[in-house]
Amino acid sequence: MSLISAVPLASSCVSKSLISSVREHTALRRAIATLQMSRRGKSVAASIRMSSATAGSDDGVKRRIGDYHSNLWDDNFIQSLSSPYGASSYGEHADRLIGEVKEIFNSFSIADGELISPVNDLLQQLWMVDNVERLGIDRHFQTEIKVALDYVYRYWSEEGIGCGRDSAFTDLNTTALAFRIFRLHGYTVSSDVFEHFKDQKGQFAASANDTELQTRSVFNLFRASLIAFPEEKVLEEAEKFAAAYLKAALQTLPVSGLSREIQYVFDYRWHSNLPRLEARSYIDILADNTISGTPDANTKKLLELAKLEFNIFHSVQQKELQCLWRWWKEWGCPELTFIRHRYVEFYTLVSGIDMVPEHATFRLSCVKTCHLITILDDMYDTFGTIDELRLFTAAVKRWDPSATECLPEYMKGVYMVLYETVNEMAKEAQKSQRRDTLGYVRQALEDYIGSYLKEAEWIATGYVPTFQEYFENGKLSSGHRIATLQPILTLSIPFPHHILQEIDFPSKFNDYAASILRLRGDTRCYKADSARGEEASCISCYMRDNPGSTQEDALNLINGMIEDMIKKLNWEFLRPDNNAPISSKKHAFNISRGLHHFYNYRDGYSVASKETKDLVIKTVLEPVLM
């Protein structure tokens, strides 16, 4: 059985659409609402139920249970999803619009030594780059973006940059926007440039007259501060100043595009932002501005292309989600009643960080890997006995179907879906990498399961480790490495050994990403984990190491560690002197952002909160109105 199916992309026309008009669009939202109401009653019984076929409920073994709700998404509803945007005519229309947007980029070029653009040419080009990136359509304009940034960078100085090449003064808005874009694209820029925008007291300050330009300038300063590297004190100061200023501004600003942009960045900072969610949000903002004002032709063209691209990928998402549903059903995953069934939520996350239609194999591999991680997590954390888990761990090291002979019945199915899926993904990776990568993945899997077994033994014996002991093991059990390694190997991007060393364990990149996931996950889950009998967490271990400390003390320390790790991860991702180019690290970094997104405010992974359900609806189930 092929576990990574060849998914039809945006090429086949679907005969009937749920989205071809406002009426049908409204009907889809009502169907989703009705579905959620009907499923809500089923998810109230949160404790895990065991079936004799899968969980040995009649074996007389006392087992711990989880407190997870059931799958929220009805099978028939998933299978009924359809979209007309896979038709070739939409792709042809998108190609024409792409050509027209390229002409906009080219209109800023120089002919016969004369600039064909207004006096604010630098800001205009930065605006174009920023907008195509926020709208999720930048992959079509990589050459144009490079030309634009190379041109603007020629005018960059230690004191910043003005809105035009002939500007007599630098300004904060253009400088902050340029700094952020340059850093994200690997250009060398120093944060010391912002020292020139402080007052005589050495502090950031705003004028008494609040204007939209001033608010926009501080907004771009705040965005720039979020990609700080370690020891950049000026960006720490900029973040504090900008955050306070913008929070106050939100109290007085009318509801507008700018206020919604500010709120979005507060809600989803760069390290937990999903590009597709940002695209959806920014499309809505620009669309509202178009209705309420008189947009220029460039904005209208960008918006038209962004909407069309969003909906074309929407048709891809539906096919891939249905493919995952078949895989999930064929392997009998719904019958494993002790696990969290979150394939829809996982797919939403993964398609939120990669919107390239041709990357179907990456997305499917990533979702399947995350679902396998969930099965193992729930089996080791709650359901399996310590003796069963030792048998399973030994079987994984053997890596042979015959190893199932000594396993309990429910574990045999778990072992085989793990074995077959990992092997099938390794075959896909071999096509991309031109070498066998199964050895890499098996070692990562053994390390991962070994860390789970250690935690299971702690639970079984009542042992509470030191903070450092728990943290080091927790970086492995976070699952970041296994969630990242095999999926990125299926990409067409080459990952020779020297580049893989910069991303995979024991690289600093992997260490910081795994640390963030472990620490943030614990701050969101420690109360629920403790209720299930899992005494060890970053919070409890810190308090045990430091008698007299409180939960608040532990959380303050851990939140500080997370902020520090985010800056270190930024550096490992964007450092210009790294052996691995940014393009090679981008997917691994975005997986880290996606996983962090699940824990943005709460455990959106175990409990599909309103925010999680809204995310599924806005980025997967619901198209944008053209």
Curated annotation (Swiss-Prot):
Annotated motif DDXXD motif, positions: 377-381
Binding residues for Mg(2+) 2: D377, D381
GO cellular component: chloroplast
GO BP terms: diterpenoid biosynthetic process; green leaf volatile biosynthetic process; terpenoid biosynthetic process
Cellular compartments annotated: Plastid, Chloroplast
GO MF annotations in UniProt: magnesium ion binding; terpene synthase activity
Keyword Disulfide bond: no
Biological or metabolic pathway of the protein: Terpene metabolism; oleoresin biosynthesis; Secondary metabolite biosynthesis; terpenoid biosynthesis
EC number: 4.2.3.107
Transit peptide, start-end: 1-45
Residues the entry annotates as binding Mg(2+) 3: D529
Main location: plastid
Keywords: Chloroplast, Lyase, Magnesium, Metal-binding, Plastid, Transit peptide
Domain of life per record: Eukaryota
Obligatory cofactor(s): Mg(2+); Mn(2+)
Domain notes: The Asp-Asp-Xaa-Xaa-Asp/Glu (DDXXD/E) motif is important for the catalytic activity, presumably through binding to Mg(2+).
PANTHER family cross-referenced by the UniProt entry: OS04G0344100 PROTEIN-RELATED (PTHR31225)
Protein name per Swiss-Prot or TrEMBL: (+)-3-carene synthase 2, chloroplastic
